């Protein structure tokens, strides 16, 4: 919006450019000149690219400003001129890089005598470096023409900006071919030898330091770019020169020639440390001194090791007699003989040499007893942690490289040939020569534990520190590194590759020393490690703003919350009990399951009326079961889920219901079975079977219609009903036990009225005198007779009650119920159990019943005892597994069924049908 409505103020640069005699300084006084230049204001660029303006800009960055100017504005114009020349505008870069007169004017800055102005030198280096990146070929060709360029550059090497310019020539030239050309040109100019010559005691410290830093950067840049540029086959010539033995020897000669100065020694050792650094295999990860990639570095730096080995005695002497230093005041007092930077770098060099694992160097260090000297310095300078770290690295290198050597021997032997000794040849290769003596690493380990007395020194230093602390003194500053050294020894003693060797050394100690070491490891060191492993996070000092008992008082007490039992959302607390998993057989494919679900839930439009009737009933039952399960009731068993998916669609087409298994119920019968169950006494008499093949009358069929009994239920023996896992509904009034609940939809009992003229409830009926339901929430009451007349009155009801003495009705909400033996007379009343899902039939014995679902079959068979009472079973979904005996199961069937089965007398006695008669009427 700012630019859209032209709210920006017009730059004053354009107004100045419209003037006839505008000067460069007037434009540079404007604050927005750099923004206008980067925005490529054409009028401004045309003005700046004039020859006079370009010469003036170059003079500003190469000549010292007048001394009489105010200091705060003295370098204002040189700084602005440098920014204008290096603002990455192609027009300015081309104008400066292609004009040789401007380049000569810029190059004249190197003709000055040192020291150069550091700020102007930075302007010059930045401008030349930008030209090298933008106009590489032109600038390189121009510099090559200058024979004294390298000499003049090294003359001002004491200025850090000129050292940066040298590194730009080495690393910032593109493409690769041109870069190799520049490297060869610099190598021909002997830039490496000249830099090494600058590391000399007679040179200035700044020149020595910058020369050393330049050599270190050349080493690192050469190795990094060599690993990144995989297409480069030709090695870096500068790196090859640096790694040559002659160059290393010349450097060491300059370091120890004549009077030794700390700056010269430190600068030279920095270059040696850079040469001994492990070579990086790439940008994926760094290869440390313990990795497998170190051998490649050793093979490259073998000339370095050969050049260093003759000078090890000089480094040992340096550790003994360093350059003299004055006493310094520290926080713990005056240090009369400081360790010094030279000895610290000497210790770093010893650690780096030990990491190379060169046998010749190891043997020379053992001969010189350098490790013993380093341990002396370790315990002498107790507050120099830099030294402590290097000594720890030396010990770790000795132990770790012994491990690597033994691993190499194990991998090289095939079990048949005698192990070979690995001896280095200086280039990282192993010479497999038979030997009886121990490898060099073991020699170094022996020297460390026997000659240097590492164990005794650890114990003595620890005991001395304990005495000091007991007397009220401070804990020594090297105790942390001493603990790590002791842990490294213990680790290699227990499971390290030099375990046997160290164990032998420990056993060779005097008895008192060995006992002290064992006690130290088992008690003192273990306790120290335990204290060191304590997590310091979330300590008391980090929560000082909190009170001590904040955690105890945080939150609310239980009594502050209201009881949630009466909450309407309390049932949803058990939402986690809902099982959303539909387990299917592993053999059933997903497509078959999907089709089964579709056929189970969706009915075709050409279904018969009776199928819709049974479907409505099952849907209501299933909905009620799911409602219970949602509020914590037990879930339907796994078999129900599988059978419902597999047989749901087919069972409805054949007039049967989906098999449902609940705890304690028998397995469902075959959906194609048409005959009713037979008892064991069927062979003794004729069985009368009722077949229900006629269409169902929609007016007489109700959702509470009874289910038939399958043969599989008869085949299964009675089983004990398990009631565990069922929900308890004692907290509220169950709907099944309500006297004023909804009337049963059964046509058999719907027209029966009570004494007051109202309709009596008509639940489904089952024999059983006073058997409570499985959940023990039912009430015992008198039940009406099996069937009733629509014209019955209250008086007839009372008469029926008298005839039905002893009969009870068990109204429950479960699937199964425990019942008692039925009455012995045909006039016995009917006990019935009303369930939301199915009809429960009472067996004729005290054994618990077992109910399941099966196709609609009604069978009448003579009882075993020959009683005139026939066994009548009418159901379509529930089967009762009962033992042989008289059974009368009266369901909520239509009056037509009762008329077909037998004649209803005035006193409501049912006459049995003749044997062999078949019932084909509607159910």
Curated annotation (Swiss-Prot):
It comes from the Eukaryota. The keyword Nucleotide-binding does not apply. Residues 430-441 have a biased composition (Polar residues). It is found in: Cytoplasm. Residues 409-441, 662-685, 743-766 are annotated as: Disordered. The modification Phosphoserine is found at residues 289, 746, 796. Belongs to the SAPS family. Protein phosphatase 6 (PP6) holoenzyme is proposed to be a heterotrimeric complex formed by the catalytic subunit, a SAPS domain-containing subunit (PP6R) and an ankyrin repeat-domain containing regulatory subunit (ARS). Interacts with PPP6C and NFKBIE. Interacts with ANKRD28. This is Serine/threonine-protein phosphatase 6 regulatory subunit 2. It comes from Mus musculus (Mouse). The gene is Ppp6r2.
